Amino acid sequence: MDNTSKLAPDAGNAKTGIAKWFSLVILLMAQIGTMGDNSGLSVATASLINELGASVSDIAFANAMYPLIAGACMIAGGMLGLIWGWKRLFQVGALLLCLAEIIAAYTDNIQVFIFAARSLSGFGASFLIPAVLGLIVGIYTDTKDRAIAFGAVAAAVGVANTAAPLVFGFLIDKFDYRVAFEALAVYFGIVFVLGFALEKIEKPTVKIKFDFVGTILVSIGLLAVIVGLLKISEWGLISPLSPSSHILGISPALPLVLFGIAVLIIFLKWENQFEIKNGACLMPQSFVKTPQLRDGLYMCGMVFFVLGAYILIGITYCQLVAGYSASDTAILLIVFSTGMLITSLATPTKFAHVSCRKLCMIGIGFCVIAAFAGALGTELDSVNMIFFGSALFTGLGCGIIASQASLIVTAAVNQRDATQSGGVQATSRNIGQTIGIAVLGSVLMFSLTNMVKSDAANSDLISVQTKQQVEQIASIPFLSDKDFTQLIEKNITETKDYPALIDINREARKSSAQLSWLVLAAMCFISIFTLTKNIPNYSLSKKS
């Protein structure tokens, strides 16, 4: 069955000036809103603990709920856009997010906050984000206009990463966390209303059947993979880190990931048959068999892989070791956002003549430089000025890659599949970030644990009893001096050994962070040559 569709071919060229870009402004507002909802929660942690009696595990669960649901349902959101229409999908997503913020603002129960508010946020984002990407493809059919639009979305991601926590934090400090969530509810309400003014994109002329079985399979598979990867640092890779967390004597993390991959393989086989029978599916064969599209998805994931790794290594070190306050961290994030803003907007306009492949290779190269700068900027109890270069080059590199990634994906397939690709693009972002956090988090924790145990065992300043007790600690997380002292107070009986252990941890903490930066640099360097081979060696940003 023909899988093309009639999609207002000149919608993006019929208007000029403000009228031409008004829809993009609305879409950018939606993108910034989803980033604000996701990042704002971390700022509200203390308020939730104090006012709702939330525990640390409750906060962790609340933080995980949004990305888990959004990540599992994004692909389904991409197909719903074809069935409902992208404009309707956009407004349903905005409405769900508005309702989620209202519940978050007025509930007095942390369980309602987690399972109602955060779940609805995840579902809302799984509709809204694919709709934003799908509408850009449908509205801006000229390649130059589309490149500018995708570059603007990339810039919005960079700005929102810094602005959202600052605004959320200001509202919490000035009023309270409920006012902050009320403000988000009003914001998404405005986005919903503005959705009526979006350019209309015609739905496919052929009636499309929704794939319920595929939705269940992909949701289970992605959830298993994401949870398994994120739990490696808590459960262990092979050997269990806790006696209560094991399956037949091994960590459940890897079996869970393998189970998820097996389910996703079944999902792909199901999708092939479903598309043959019905003409459309969650994962069209063009997504699976088109090399250019696959590399485009790798680039979507690469941006968030680097972002996740940078936040995990860089921001964590600044706050726990260097003692950065919220305002100090904001300055670092502003440097990052400035870099991302510059390149995401300049690349499709000032460098439209440069090939996509070369731009992506340059962008990843900047990320390699950023990782080396992170390693060089890391000191025993602080970070130096080189560390700010890491933030800048991370932003510059991610901005270049993000400006090209969606273009590469949408240019690889027909118009209908291009609009549907928003869901799989968003999913690749989530998976990329998950891999970044999982891999670098594991390197950070396992190397730190091994270094502390090894240095303690070889130290002449520590008693034999203390060495044995250190060896018995399953894992040593990345902690501030204060928190590390509390850890050894629970596990080490010889108080005279505490100063030596704290010094050992400081050295190991620095070395493990530097090692993690170098692993990130190596992974990015390898990606330059392995993940860009099928990206077009010509520009996709020139006017069509």
Residue ranges: model-predicted function:
Residues 1-23, 273, 468-544:
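Transmembrane-helix exit segments and adjacent C-terminal regions of multi-pass membrane proteins
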Residues 387-473, 532:
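Small-residue-rich alpha-helical segments with characteristic i,i+4
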